[in-house]
């Protein structure tokens, strides 16, 4: 049996990779089967819970909701200003990645993981913004629905008849530190 012998450089690279992983933030995804099941609500409730335990929590971007209970949960959280821009005569409000990196909280809330950013943003997709936050050592809570996962998109579309264009690579979901399923009881 041949023994594989690694060079000292190989081991140094492995040690450096481990150091980077130790400094990387953790991703928690609030995962649902459809819009309106309460993902943002659950994320905000969890944020208030960890804040009570002394964690520095900031709302980076929360999708505006017509649900009063969800909107009320933003109260008591520091909210970063959105990045506002004009595009084709429309005013767009986006997650402000630079403000988040400058503030550098322990935990940031960023709704809608699969969102496609406006052209003024550094990254095309919100999951890329979140990746940058994680690499900066910031923990992230976010939300996503099953149909936005690349490998499940076609299957969900064949059942629902609805094709979504905003998707995340499976690797983003697979690399999450924690996934919390959020669902509601079917109506009788």
Task: Label the predicted regions.
Residues 24-102:
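Conserved P-loop
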Residues 63-68, 114-115, 140, 146-151, ...:
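Conserved nucleotide-binding/hydrolysis micro-motifs of P-loop NTPases
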Residues 37-44, 48-57, 120-121, 140, ...:
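An amphipathic, basic-hydrophobic helix/alpha-beta surface used to engage anionic
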Residues 108-110, 139-146, 175, 182:
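Structural recognition of the conserved hydrophobic beta-strand(s) that form the central parallel beta-sheet
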Residues 147-188:
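Conserved phosphate-handling catalytic cores of large alpha/beta enzymes
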Residues 112-127, 151-154:
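Conserved ATPase-coupling elements of RecA-like P-loop NTPase cores
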Residues 9-23:
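Pre-Walker A adenine-sensing motif
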Residues 56, 104-107, 133-142:
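Loop/turn-to-beta-strand initiation segments
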């Amino acid at each position: 049996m041949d023994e594989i012998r690694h060079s000292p450089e190989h081991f140094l690279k492995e040690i450096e990779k481990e150091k980077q992983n130790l400094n990387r933030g953790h991703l928690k995804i609030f995962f649902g089967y459809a819009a309106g099941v309460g993902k943002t609500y659950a994320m905000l409730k969890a944020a208030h819970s960890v804040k009570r335990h002394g964690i520095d929590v900031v709302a980076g971007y929360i999708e505006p909701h017509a649900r009063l209970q969800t909107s009320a949960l933003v109260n008591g959280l520091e909210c970063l200003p959105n990045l506002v821009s004009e595009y084709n005569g429309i005013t767009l409000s986006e997650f402000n990645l630079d403000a988040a990196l400058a503030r550098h909280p322990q935990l940031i809330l960023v709704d809608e993981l699969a969102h496609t950013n406006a052209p003024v943003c550094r990254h095309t997709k919100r999951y890329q913004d979140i990746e940058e936050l994680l690499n900066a050592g910031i923990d992230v809570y976010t939300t996503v629905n099953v149909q936005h996962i690349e490998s499940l998109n076609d299957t969900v579309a064949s059942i629902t008849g609805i094709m979504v264009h905003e998707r995340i690579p499976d690797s983003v979901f697979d690399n999450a530190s924690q996934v919390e399923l959020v669902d509601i009881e079917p109506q009788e």
